[in-house]
Amino acid sequence: MNIAVIGLSHKTAPVDVREKLSVPEDVRERALQHLCGYAHIQEATILSTCNRLEIYIVTSDTEVGVREVHQFLSEWSHIPLPQLRPYLFILLHQDAVMHLMRVASGLDSLVIGEGQILSQVKRCHQLGQQYKSIGPILNRVFTGAIAAGKRVRTETSIGTGAVSISSAAVELADLRLQNLQNCRIAVVGAGKMSRLVVQHLIARGVKEIRIINRSLERAQELAQQFPEVRFELFTMTDLLPIVAAMDLVFTSTAATEPLLDRDNLGAVLVGDRSLAIIDISVPRNVHANVTELGTVQLFNVDDLQAVVAQNQEARRQLAQEAEGILEEELETFLAWWHALETVPIIRSLRQKMEAIRTQELEKALSRLGSEFADKHQGVIEAMTRTIINKILHDPTVQLQSQRDLESRQRAMQTLQDLFNLEPIEA
């Protein structure tokens, strides 16, 4: 079995491409069923965040399995494969495993060391288990990556004071508007990202915030976490008039279609007062055409790069320390994986050796006579087992220690050919 990851991220694709490949949780089961319906995909799970869409698979045939994922991505996004392919990356075997470890540790994030990605990797693993799309191999890949992510955060300082997407959004707002305390501010959405935006606004002295959310109850739960701030809470029916009255709006909802566009926003804006909108959602909550309204400034997650870059250099140095931890965790995984892959051929070889040992032992004992056999059978039995174990020890260790996939598979094929083995299922 082969491990692969196929996907795209903030490093390979702009937000207008990433949003078309987003796989929200409410459709995750359908997407996983679709993936696992392909003939060459035995296990699969999907990591979908605002900055990445990655599909992890276990496949019996790497080339065909990757091709099946490409087909899925093209169908899901409605983007022809020739247009989509330049944005995609493919990593195989241990490179795919190391990539997930780096992702879970925050080393591959837009914001190096950010902590939210570890929770997202855990959730990806949970959903794969819940929908029964992952088996023993991906289960071990993800438990190893999660363990690696925890170690990096525990044993290094990479997460200390890390900029997050939410804090970068507030930083960008502060750079653009300067005095946030005197701005009329609204946050659209009441999830984790919105909570972090509120938290960072409060840290900059903001005392009044409007929350707009589909569920008023969720908005109330968010507001109750920050009793020191005066909140006004609204449902989505009030979205347009509230936004039109603001100086600054943050949007972070799970909506799959834009909530704001040139037409609906233009209909409610009055006068020439400026409005800044920072959209940290993927798919985007705000259509790019709002910038055609002369008084509106729009920023999305890709516009946060400059803000994030300010504290990245120090974090890159800490990331080198984290890479050593990941190498240790990768070694642990590879030892397990290599042993797992070689189990069928080793078991088949041992079964053949045991059959020969048993057959020859019976012949020898029958020639020695019943009196000798009864007296010494236990000793001879133990001796022959020890001989078999010692003969097989070195080939077993050498086979399991082969790190290179092709070399290991050649060695397994050689054993099968030399001993005329019939491989059994793992």
Curated annotation (Swiss-Prot):
Record-linked PROSITE patterns: GLUTR
Site (Important for activity): H99
Subunit structure, interactors included: Homodimer.
Pathway of action: Porphyrin-containing compound metabolism; protoporphyrin-IX biosynthesis; 5-aminolevulinate from L-glutamyl-tRNA(Glu): step 1/2; Porphyrin-containing compound metabolism; chlorophyll biosynthesis
Other notes: During catalysis, the active site Cys acts as a nucleophile attacking the alpha-carbonyl group of tRNA-bound glutamate with the formation of a thioester intermediate between enzyme and glutamate, and the concomitant release of tRNA(Glu). The thioester intermediate is finally reduced by direct hydride transfer from NADPH, to form the product GSA.
Entry protein name: Glutamyl-tRNA reductase
Example GO BP: protoporphyrinogen IX biosynthetic process
Taxon lineage: Bacteria, Bacillati, Cyanobacteriota, Cyanophyceae, Acaryochloridales
Entry binding sites for NADP(+): G189, A190, G191, K192, M193, S194
Purpose of the protein: Catalyzes the NADPH-dependent reduction of glutamyl-tRNA(Glu) to glutamate 1-semialdehyde (GSA).
Domain of life: Bacteria
InterPro entries: 4pyrrol_synth_GluRdtase, 4pyrrol_synth_GluRdtase_dimer, 4pyrrol_synth_GluRdtase_N, GluRdtase_CS, GluRdtase_dimer_dom_sf, GluRdtase_N_sf, NAD(P)-bd_dom_sf, Shikm_DH/Glu-tRNA_Rdtase
Catalytic activity: (S)-4-amino-5-oxopentanoate + tRNA(Glu) + NADP(+) = L-glutamyl-tRNA(Glu) + NADPH + H(+)
Positions of the catalytic residues: C50
EC number: 1.2.1.70
Binding site for substrate: T49, C50, N51, R52, S109, E114, G115, Q116, Q120
Family classification: Belongs to the glutamyl-tRNA reductase family.
Molecular function terms, GO-annotated: glutamyl-tRNA reductase activity; NADP binding
Written domain comment of the UniProt record: Possesses an unusual extended V-shaped dimeric structure with each monomer consisting of three distinct domains arranged along a curved 'spinal' alpha-helix. The N-terminal catalytic domain specifically recognizes the glutamate moiety of the substrate. The second domain is the NADPH-binding domain, and the third C-terminal domain is responsible for dimerization.
Keyword list, A-Z: Chlorophyll biosynthesis, NADP, Oxidoreductase, Porphyrin biosynthesis
